Amino acid sequence: MSQALKNLLTLLNLEKIEEGLFRGQSEDLGLRQVFGGQVVGQALYAAKETVPEERLVHSFHSYFLRPGDSKKPIIYDVETLRDGNSFSARRVAAIQNGKPIFYMTASFQAPEAGFEHQKTMPSAPAPDGLPSETQIAQSLAHLLPPVLKDKFICDRPLEVRPVEFHNPLKGHVAEPHRQVWIRANGSVPDDLRVHQYLLGYASDLNFLPVALQPHGIGFLEPGIQIATIDHSMWFHRPFNLNEWLLYSVESTSASSARGFVRGEFYTQDGVLVASTVQEGVMRNHN
């Protein structure tokens, strides 16, 4: 396991304060606030700690209410909404400075047989031979602002290989579609619940910026503000984050200073394992 992956697993492994109450640390990725995927992953960890082990998260719906401070810990307060014969529901509040910054409602279910069908995986080049985002960042290190340089060129917990590179510092006009391959940078423990909250973390990577592509804007360009409003995810089938997953993302709308994106995770052999939807603020202050 790489040190970067070990650090992320430690970050997402919360300290239990008392029943239903957890504390998580924050990481600074060089962004303007706490990375949304961190809050999602930590909230999923907190929620799963309160349900029977055989019940796995199959969906969550969340709202980001305030920017999180990457220099302060976050408290996660888990409320039990229901424990039924088949499903468990939890509501999680993420709190900083005495105020909620995020709410999540998550539903859990034990594996159960039933009807099966899925969308066909879109075509995409294989990940072999594609450069990783870290390799791309290292090749562009001389162009990176000092505040971002160390964050972007360091070893990362997840290896991300874009099919087409979109420069966050200088965008180019493109169709609102993006495909990236993602896998863990090292070996994730053999526990599907761990893989699920790691994928929750990963689901916020290469997501909302896709809505900027038709406008030729990179999300780190001066004067550009983007921030998640809500983020939802559905886990359809088991998966292994030690193996490549294709994250296929599209933006179907942008209006009223908001961008809308949706994505799908597929295994290399075409199994649809998860779906995502997000809406966020997109403003050009220039």
From Swiss-Prot:
Q: Which InterPro entries match?
A: Acyl-CoA_hotdog (IPR042171), Acyl_CoA_thio (IPR003703), HotDog_dom_sf (IPR029069), TesB_ACOT8-like_N (IPR049449), TesB_C (IPR025652)
Q: Quote a single Gene Ontology cellular component term.
A: cytosol
Q: EC number(s) for this protein?
A: 3.1.2.20
Technological use: Has been used in the engineered enzymatic high-level production of enantiomerically pure (R)- and (S)-3-hydroxybutanoate, used as a building block for the synthesis of optically active fine chemicals, such as vitamins, antibiotics, pheromones, and flavor compounds. Chemical synthesis of chiral 3-hydroxybutanoate (3HB) is not economically feasible.
User: What does its activity-regulation comment describe?
Assistant: Inhibited by iodoacetamide and diethylpyrocarbonate in vitro, but is insensitive to iodoacetate treatment.
SUPFAM superfamilies attached to this UniProt entry: Thioesterase/thiol ester dehydrase-isomerase
Catalysed reactions, as listed in the record? a fatty acyl-CoA + H2O = a fatty acid + CoA + H(+); tetradecanoyl-CoA + H2O = tetradecanoate + CoA + H(+); (3E,5Z)-tetradecadienoyl-CoA + H2O = (3E,5Z)-tetradecadienoate + CoA + H(+); dodecanoyl-CoA + H2O = dodecanoate + CoA + H(+)
Q: Does the keyword Transport apply?
A: no
Recorded phenotype for the gene knockout or disruption: Deletion of this gene decreases the growth rate of cells on conjugated linoleate but not on palmitate. Deletion of this gene also decreases 3-hydroxybutanoate, 3-hydroxyhexanoate, 3-hydroxyoctanoate, and hexanoate in medium after cultivation with oleate as a sole carbon source.
- Has keyword Methyltransferase? no
Which keywords label this protein?
Hydrolase, Lipid metabolism
Q: Which domain of life is it from?
A: Bacteria
Top EC class, one word: hydrolase
Q: What is the effect of changing S107C?
A: 2-fold reduction in catalytic activity
Biological process GO annotation list? acyl-CoA metabolic process; fatty acid catabolic process
GO molecular function terms here? fatty acyl-CoA hydrolase activity; identical protein binding; protein homodimerization activity
- So where's the catalytic machinery, residue-wise? D204, T228, Q278
Please report which protein family the annotation says this sequence is part of: Belongs to the C/M/P thioester hydrolase family.
> What role is this protein assigned?
Thioesterase that has relatively broad substrate specificity, hydrolyzing primarily medium- and long-chain acyl-CoA substrates to free fatty acids and CoA. Functions in the thioesterase-dependent pathway of beta-oxidation of oleate and conjugated linoleate ((9Z,11E)-octadecadienoate or CLA), which provides all energy and carbon precursors required for the growth of E.coli.
PANTHER family recorded: ACYL-COA THIOESTERASE (PTHR11066), ACYL-COENZYME A THIOESTERASE 8 (PTHR11066:SF34)
What is the name listed in the Swiss-Prot or TrEMBL entry for this protein? Acyl-CoA thioesterase 2
